Amino acid sequence: AGFAAANDVGCHDYRDTDAGSMLRVKGMDGFCPIGPGIVSGVDVRESLIRTYLNGEVVQDALVSDMIFGIDYQLADLCRHMTLLPGDMILTGTPANSRPMQPGDVIEVEVSGLGRLTNTVAERPAPNEAVGHQPACSEAVRRVALGSDFDAGDVRIED
């Protein structure tokens, strides 16, 4: 068993289109990079998680500040499924997720585990002749980014 940093990427434009399903939101090619390696023998419960967007800190929190701690999450998962060697469990992200654009450099750092660095690539346009097309709404932005995000001229109502 071990721990690693992960960048839990999501394309929330599909959230409304797919009636809440997270398959396309979280399951596109290149999503969820993990690394820089798996580290064992580290107690991450007091680790600091930091996310950088183009060198600027946009998320900064302790693992111990999570609403559901690692011990609770593992116990809850084990009540419902068998965990096998090699299974990856993502525990969540600190508040203040931010949108990314092609060319942005995203770094996820967990103290004791290292720093994962990724550059956002342009994704191919969806095939307009097949399936539901991506769309964005104010409600989706609020869920995806948190209510404190300044969306510019996008109005987010309560």
Question: Language-model segments: which ranges?
Answer:
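RNA pseudouridine synthases
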Residues: A1-A6
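Catalytic-pocket segment enriched in acidic/His residues
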Residues: H12-R155
